[in-house]
């Protein structure tokens, strides 16, 4: 923060934001601490920890790194998340990647709820999907997705991104559209998935696939129950470390 920043006012806004978020998930004790620390380039400092890595036959690398010689035969995805979420390194993202790969066809239209950097929609297009739509609450997701799609050679005619809360914003729901998606993917917190699932059923085509993650293992049954309660058939539950992905189908 700048020297003249009003820390108390900022903390108040943080509390207000947490109040809003608590409508969708349990935030625990919500303890907030503040203090002074050394001034560093925090926006870019994290980049030293983001190195090229593989997910099965896919090489995911930051835009500022070169392709390792031993991985030049892999499907290449380049990512610069900026301030949006999504490098692909987290177990939940990798769980979603594998399920998207499994269910994507050349006719697939995919909706990515909470798209962040755009990595999941981008990979669906790399796997051969026809069109991708992403939604996010963070305005940074638009710029990050457009930049990442461009650096990966994906045409603007193949995707779109919109900002808004699809759970309770009818305008966003209408803009996204109903009954038009072969796949809906949501890599979000489990408690948000519980609220999202009954809404997202309307966006899926009959026979469409719903891929979820962001689920810690002790929340697995909560999400499975929400998926079943929405009338979806659970097809698979997959695991990586302590994280879970639930994949279901809308039968019509």
Task: Kindly give the residue locations of the regions a language model identified.
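N-terminal auxiliary segments of SAM/dcSAM-dependent transferases
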Residues: 1-70
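S-adenosylmethionine
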Residues: 137-251
């Amino acid at each position: 923060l700048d020297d003249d920043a009003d820390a108390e006012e900022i903390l108040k806004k943080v509390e207000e934001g947490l109040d809003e978020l608590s409508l969708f998930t349990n935030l625990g004790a919500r303890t907030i601490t503040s203090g002074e620390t050394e001034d560093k380039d925090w926006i870019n400092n994290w980049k030293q920890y983001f190195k090229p890595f593989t997910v099965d036959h896919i090489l995911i690398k930051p835009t500022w790194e070169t392709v390792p010689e031993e991985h030049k035969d892999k499907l290449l995805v380049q990512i610069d998340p900026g301030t949006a979420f999504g490098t692909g390194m987290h177990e939940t993202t990798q769980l979603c990647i594998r399920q998207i790969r499994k269910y994507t066809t050349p006719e697939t239209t995919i909706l990515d709820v909470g798209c962040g950097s755009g990595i999941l929609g981008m990979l669906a297009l790399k796997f051969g999907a026809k069109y991708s739509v992403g939604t996010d609450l963070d305005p940074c997701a638009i710029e990050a997705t457009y930049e990442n799609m461009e650096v990966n050679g994906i045409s603007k005619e193949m995707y779109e991104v919109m900002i808004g809360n699809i759970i309770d914003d009818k305008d966003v729901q209408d803009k996204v559209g109903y009954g038009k998606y072969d796949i809906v993917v949501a890599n979000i917190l489990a408690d948000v998935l519980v609220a999202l699932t009954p809404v997202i059923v309307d966006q899926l085509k009959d026979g469409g696939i719903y891929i979820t993650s962001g689920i810690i293992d002790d929340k697995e049954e909560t999400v499975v129950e929400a998926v079943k309660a929405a009338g979806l058939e659970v097809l698979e539950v997959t695991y990586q470390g302590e994280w879970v992905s639930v994949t279901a189908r809308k039968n019509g």
